[in-house]
From Swiss-Prot:
Record-linked InterPro entries: HisE (IPR008179), PRib-ATP_PPHydrolase-like (IPR021130)
Record keywords, A-Z: Amino-acid biosynthesis, ATP-binding, Cytoplasm, Histidine biosynthesis, Hydrolase, Nucleotide-binding
UniProt name for this protein: Phosphoribosyl-ATP pyrophosphatase
Source organism (scientific name): Rhodospirillum rubrum (strain ATCC 11170 / ATH 1.1.1 / DSM 467 / LMG 4362 / NCIMB 8255 / S1)
Reactions catalysed, as given in the entry: 1-(5-phospho-beta-D-ribosyl)-ATP + H2O = 1-(5-phospho-beta-D-ribosyl)-5'-AMP + diphosphate + H(+)
Length: 117
């Protein structure tokens, strides 16, 4: 999924998102021969979107017919590819967290209705 040596991986928890975002950002513009992430960026947004869609589908399939462990593995792939997509369009995790915070405590039905106005 990423090119981070295990020795420098942050501990499990929310801070891993910021660490992964920093690694992903560092791969933008890098030589595609040096990392999978750089290769994805080099292939363009269409390929990034395609990979995200494939991984989202795979987590759905895993939820239907595979083990919880496979759902976890596929979910990590979805998050990684989503974060590559965010980076490609210039969105940081903080912006997504802010939007989630804005919506928190609002009914999903009410939030969706407000978007139609």
């Amino acid at each position: 999924m990423t090119d981070i040596p295990p020795a420098v991986s942050p501990p499990p928890g929310p801070e891993i998102i910021d660490a992964l975002a920093a690694v992903i950002a560092s791969r933008q513009g890098a030589d595609p021969a040096t990392s999978y992430t750089a290769k994805l960026f080099g292939r363009g947004r269409g390929k990034i979107v395609q990979k995200f869609g494939e991984e989202a589908f795979e987590v759905g399939v895993a939820a239907l017919v595979e083990s919880p462990e496979q759902v976890v593995a596929e979910s990590a792939d979805v998050l990684y590819h989503l974060m590559v997509l965010w980076a490609d369009v210039g969105v940081t995790p903080d912006r997504v967290w802010a939007e989630l915070a804005r919506r928190f405590g609002t009914s999903g039905i009410d939030e969706k209705a407000a978007r139609k106005k």
